[in-house]
Amino acid sequence: MIEGMYEKLVRPALFKMDPEQAHNLVHKFAPLLAYSPIRFQFTAANLQTNLSGLVLKNPVGLAAGFDKNGNLVKVLDRLGFGFAEIGSVCAEATSGNPRPRLFRLPSDNAVINRLGLNGDGAEAVAQRLAKAKFALPTGLNIAKTNLPDIQGDKAVEDVLKTFDQIKSLPLAYVAFNASCPNTHEGILNERQQLNDIMAEVQKKNVAGLPIFIKMSPDSTEQLITDIVEISQVHGMAGFICGNTTLSRDGLNTDSARVAQIGMGGLSGQPLKSKALNLCRRVAQLKLPTQQIIACGGIATGRDAFEFLRAGAAALQLYTALVYHGPTLVARINQELSVLLQQELVRTEPQLISENSS
C-alpha cells in the first residue's frame, strides 16, 4: 500500500521539482521518522551479515551521498537498512559545482550528478557526530576537498586532515573515496599518492578502524591491481565496488537529452553490469580476509543476490530509493531472504532436512 502511494502520489510530486530541491525537501522531513511508529523493515536469520567483525541485521546499506553531513544518522534504521555510510566528507567546507548539477533519467531509473563534493567540512561533521546517537552501524566516506589548488602532496595532507578529525568517532568503518569523477583532478588514482595516504592513515589509526577503498567501475585493470596491492600492503579491510560511471552506454534516455545534461557521474540501474564486473575482478585479487561492499544498480533482491554471489559481503544503494521509495529496502531483503533459502535447499538439502526435524 505504502509502496503504491509513493509511486502514484509522492514520486510524481517530487519529480515535478528540481532534483536537488526534492532531495533537500526529503532531508527536511526525514528527521520526523524518529517519531513515526512505522518501520519499513524485514528481518530474517539468514540475512545476518558479518562486516569487519560487526554483525549486521541485513547486508543492505545506504551508500554515501544521501547523508553527506551526518544529519540523519539517528533515523536511517527506519528505512530497513543494515548499515549506512555518510559523506563524502572533505577537510574543508565547499559549495560544490554550480547548479544545476543533479539530473534524473526516469527512462533508465538513473541519475546523473556533478555535485562536486559539496558539504560542511570535516570539523563540522565530526562535531555533529560526536553528539549523535547512531541508529545503525555507520561508516564514513572521506574524499579530497574539491578545490583546484589541492593536488599532489596537498591532496595527501587534505585527506589526512579529515581522518584526524573523525578517527576517534564510534564508526563501523572508514572509506576512502578514490573514485569521484566530479572534482578537480578527478580521482586519487596515482599509485604513489594512494600508497602514501594509506601508509599515513594506518599510522594514525590507533583505534583500529576498518579501512575500505571505494573504487570506480571505470577503473583500468592496472588501477584495480594497484589499489588491491596497496590495500594488502597496508592492511586495508576491503573495498567498495564501485561508484558512479562516466559512461553513457546503453541508455534509454534520448541521446540529445543526455548530451544536454553534459558531464557528471551516472548512477542507478545502467551501472549494474559495470559494478558486477568490478566486484568479480576484485574478488579474484583480494585476500580471503578482505571484504567487498558492492554498490551500483541494486534495486531488487535478485540484484542483491547476484552481487553476493559475485563475491560481495554487503551491499549499498541510493539511486533506487529515488525511484522506489521507503519500502524498497524491506522488499529487497524479503526477496533476498527467499533466494538465499532456495539456494540452501538446492545445494544442501540434507542440512535443511535435519534442521526441520
Task: Outline where the language-model segments fall.
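C-terminal helical cap(s) of enzyme catalytic domains, especially alpha/beta-barrels
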Residues: 93-109, 249-264, 320-345
